[in-house]
């Protein structure tokens, strides 16, 4: 049984590491710019790709995926699946809402990929396939993301694994609902206004 000190330290560390947005650092280092001041205003891979180029986008994707994978792997080795799951959710939350930059972060896709590869890699191929299909059908990555992550709890329930994996799916779905839900609602509202 892990102590509360270990659990809270792990969560804080994961949030802090998750908050280190690759897009922010790379835009400063390579271009002396703040990616949050251009395009969509977030520090994630897609905004970097669209506004700073393919190379910067790829480096941002690798950075954000790696930070999620590494911090959760550390948690899994040090405290087992339960601590790993808590740290995974904290890392994604840190990426989406970093304290360092007034909670203006990315959308969490690359970091979610990293934590999923650490916690339950078998979920990644079907998740990526579903995400690709939904993006093709809806032509909207926010809606596709929301639908894909909403399916995660169902996947883990179907797999009948330990309860912490179901909690992982529910937690990621909730985080993505908070991050992408308002964007999807805004999209539908704008479409309705145009009619």
Swiss-Prot record:
Major place of residence: membrane
GO molecular function, one term: acyl-phosphate glycerol-3-phosphate acyltransferase activity
Stated role: Catalyzes the transfer of an acyl group from acyl-phosphate (acyl-PO(4)) to glycerol-3-phosphate (G3P) to form lysophosphatidic acid (LPA). This enzyme utilizes acyl-phosphate as fatty acyl donor, but not acyl-CoA or acyl-ACP.
Mode of membrane association: Multi-pass membrane protein
Quaternary structure note: Probably interacts with PlsX.
Protein name from the UniProt record: Glycerol-3-phosphate acyltransferase 1
GO biological process: phospholipid biosynthetic process
PANTHER family the record matches: GLYCEROL-3-PHOSPHATE ACYLTRANSFERASE-RELATED, INNER MEMBRANE PROTEIN YGIH
InterPro entries (UniProt xref): G3P_acylTferase_PlsY
